[in-house]
Amino acid sequence: MLRILIMSDSHGRNENVELAIAQVREEIGEIQMLIHLGDVGDARELESLAGVPCYIVRGNTDYDAKLLNANVIEAGGHRIFATHGHLYQVDMRLDLLRFAALENDCDIAMYGHTHVPYLEEDPDDITILNPGSISKPRQADHRYTYMVMEIDDEDEVTYELRYVE
């Protein structure tokens, strides 16, 4: 089983990042990977907090030249296209993101930027998700959110939207 913690838009507010990591470890178990979808603040601090391999993409408020605008991540038998999303106009549409994922032979696309959680699972196409924001939520209930993705031994994927408590 591969367990991946997915978050976005922490904007350097790492107290909720720490809480999310601790919650997952206590309630579900250890994570093997962390994916941060941009507007991270200090990437090195996040990597230190996680203690597992981290894949971090550049958001529209990140200025670390080492961060990529998009990254293709291999996880189990899946390929994940990870990006912040602002360069793909995700606040208005998702087709550009979907096309970018397809061009990179990915079956999962992840983005941030909107601060609103989203999950569209399509086994015949691409699963698209946004974990929302761990520090500045914009959905109706204004709760801090993140996602946990699990890939089992048969490469079946499950997603869970979780709240920082």
What are these regions (language model features)?
Residues 12, 18-19, 76, 99-105, ...:
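Binuclear metal-dependent phosphoesterase catalytic core
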Residues 11-15, 40-44, 61-67, 88-92, ...:
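Active-site environment of divalent metal-dependent phosphoester hydrolases
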Residues 1-51, 63-64, 68-69, 141-145, ...:
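N-terminal active-site segment of His-dependent metallophosphoesterases
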Residues 2, 32, 52, 78, ...:
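A structural micro-motif
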Residues 53-99, 103-104:
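Helix-adjacent hinge/juxtasegments
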Residues 6-8, 33-39, 55-60, 81-84, ...:
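Active-site neighborhood of phospho(di)ester-bond hydrolases with catalytic His/Asp-centered motifs
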Residues 52, 120-135:
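Short acidic, glycine/proline-enriched helix-loop-strand junctions
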